[in-house]
């Protein structure tokens, strides 16, 4: 038990606070439905570097800063305290991120954007709405999926993959 706690403390994903539990996850999920997250969305640029050339932007990943989100909704709870409960919370974060991005004008993106989403999000109505709002810019949106999510439900992954491929 002591070794497990020490490993958690050393984890690069560890956040301060008590371990996330089911009751707390439910309460946080409710808060996430209405908390402002627009100012918590960050951008990370992926650049390809070729020998003898300057770097070219591949895409700009859009994500919600989890440490800032923790400070806003649950400053005394380590959101990474339980892998599966964190996964549950990210589904709500995904929906909120899509809602914020859908409200922006994404029709004239200079660079591609990347979103790391849960498979359940890709299969949900919020993603369908986002896809409609992006319109002709769908070729500029890259969707990343987590391997753990893929292997947890291969049938859902295949449905999501087919949906994404069929919709551009």
Task: Give the positions of each predicted feature.
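The catalytic core of metal-dependent phosphodiesterases that act on cyclic dinucleotides
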Residues: 133-168
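Flexible, Lys/Arg-rich cytosolic regulatory linkers and terminal tails that connect or flank
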Residues: 4-6
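Bacterial c-di-GMP phosphodiesterase EAL domain
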Residues: 8-136
């Amino acid at each position: 038990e002591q070794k497990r706690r020490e490993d958690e403390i050393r984890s690069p994903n560890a956040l301060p606070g008590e371990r996330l539990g089911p009751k707390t996850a439910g309460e946080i999920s409710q808060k996430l439905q209405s908390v402002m997250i627009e100012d918590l969305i960050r951008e990370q640029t992926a650049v390809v570097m070729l020998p003898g050339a300057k770097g070219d932007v591949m895409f700009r990943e859009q994500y919600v800063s989890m440490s800032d989100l923790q400070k806003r909704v649950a400053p005394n709870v380590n959101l990474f305290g339980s892998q599966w409960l964190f996964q549950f919370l990210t589904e709500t974060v995904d929906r909120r991120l899509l809602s914020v991005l859908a409200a922006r004008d994404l029709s004239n993106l200079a660079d591609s954007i990347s979103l790391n989403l849960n498979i359940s999000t890709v299969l949900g109505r919020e993603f369908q709405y986002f896809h409609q709002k992006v319109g002709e810019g769908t070729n500029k949106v890259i969707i990343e999926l987590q391997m753990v999510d893929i292997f947890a439900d291969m049938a859902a992954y295949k449905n999501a993959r087919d949906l994404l491929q069929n919709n551009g």
